[in-house]
Amino acid sequence: MSSSSASQPSHDQLATKAQAWSALFSEPMSDLVKRYTSSVFFDKRLWQADIAGSLAHAEMLAAQGIISAQDHADIQKGMAQITQEIASGAFEWKLDLEDVHLNIEARLTQLVGDAGKRLHTGRSRNDQVATDVRLWLRGEIDLIEGLLSELQLSLVEVAEQNVEVILPGFTHLQVAQPVSFAHHLLAYVEMFARDAERMRDVRRRVNVLPLGSAALAGTTYPLDRERVAKTLGMEGVCQNSLDGVSDRDFAIEFTAAASLCMVHVSRLSEELIIWMSQNFGFIKIADRFTTGSSIMPQKKNPDVPELARGKTGRVVGHLMGLITLMKGQPLAYNKDNQEDKEPLFDTVDTLKDTLRIFAEMIGGQMNPATGCKDGGITVNAEAMRAAALKGYATATDLADYLVKKGLPFRDAHETVAHAVKAAVSHSVDLSELPLAVLQGFHPAIEKDVFDALSLQGSLNARNTLGGTAPAQVRTQLARHRARLSA
């Protein structure tokens, strides 16, 4: 058990008590080993999945004639009471019972007697925990997909208001070409859309039933595994019992998808941090997402995006931990796999919290009085435009203009470099150089060059699929609106 577990066991929970498996052993487990090997204080969050799996298993056992109808009814009644106790906080989690499974089974047996002891027929904790984690993760993936949709909608809403706002596009963090601010935001919508696709794809492989694999070799009881899978809404059953109980590739795959999603959040965070700095001043974020300084009264720090950037390393670290956890394990189940839960749980918690916060930080919060969102990012269009002009963002447009006049691109590139040098020496934008000066660099330049050199002209000219022209951006906005509304 991790030393960072939120709840520490009380002294009476450590009282020596027979374990569910202890009949073979000549001495009780030491308190230190109990603490070290117990997982109940973090895996208890699996209780709903554990009860759902047990109820489906019991229903199948009764249908197959392995337990009686009365035992089945008693198990259902006992599980209903346990559900109420856990939900209300009245359930007593005990360290001696090691994990969520044995805690629930022990309470069930206390409530309904022998029927509770019969529930574990045909299964092991090995296939039970693999089932629980899959059921739990399936539900969390569904929540994450919804949160990804909310974040995409927030970005789309801000983009819709800023189609004509011109942002300097950067390469190497140097001004490159002008782009629509909406176009820039939609790049992140594309990333988060792929993240959602990955989550859906992972879900298919998560949503498979290990239960019935038993400890490792299957079971001698006539279980109907497909019936249990159908009851639990799973798409099929694990076809190899050794694989079903031992592999955690589904957890690794989810954490990889979560890591990619957090990397996208981190890239967005970096840009928000840069944009809101005094040196850029492109945006402001609402005060509730910033903090002050204990010594410098003028500071308004972007702690939320900074923390998201930092938490990305945390999630990527969990991915590396899970991969390392699995790499040396022989078949089948090993106790190492107990260490899959804390990184998996923390990855889910971190990702969900981050997506929720970013959706509100970017798009704002619904105001019931107005029916509109308040408090999203505030855009400084003038600062963006000034930065684009200062960086000679239309230099490529001048080169393209000369190519259309018949120059080879490399010659046009060199000609424009000389023009930029002249503009820099006079502290003006290319569009502010007189026509006569521009013609000195090449006689093919005519008055229409100023259409190409304007920021708006540069935007409008990039009217190919996926380009930054406002017409293209509006088409993409409509596509995303339709997709997210479906």
UniProtKB/Swiss-Prot annotation:
Pathway: Amino-acid biosynthesis; L-arginine biosynthesis; L-arginine from L-ornithine and carbamoyl phosphate: step 3/3. The keyword Amino-acid biosynthesis applies. SUPFAM superfamilies: L-aspartase-like. It is an enzyme of class 4 (lyase). The keyword Cytoplasm applies. GO terms for molecular function: argininosuccinate lyase activity. Keywords: Amino-acid biosynthesis, Arginine biosynthesis, Cytoplasm, Lyase. It is found in: Cytoplasm. GO terms for biological process: arginine biosynthetic process via ornithine; L-arginine biosynthetic process. GO terms for cellular component: cytosol. It catalyses: 2-(N(omega)-L-arginino)succinate = fumarate + L-arginine. Its main location: cytoplasm. Its EC number is 4.3.2.1. InterPro entries: Arg_succ_lyase_C, Argininosuccinate_lyase, Fumarase/histidase_N, Fumarate_lyase_CS, Fumarate_lyase_fam, Fumarate_lyase_N, L-Aspartase-like. NCBIfam families: argH. Belongs to the lyase 1 family. Argininosuccinate lyase subfamily. This is Argininosuccinate lyase. The gene is argH.
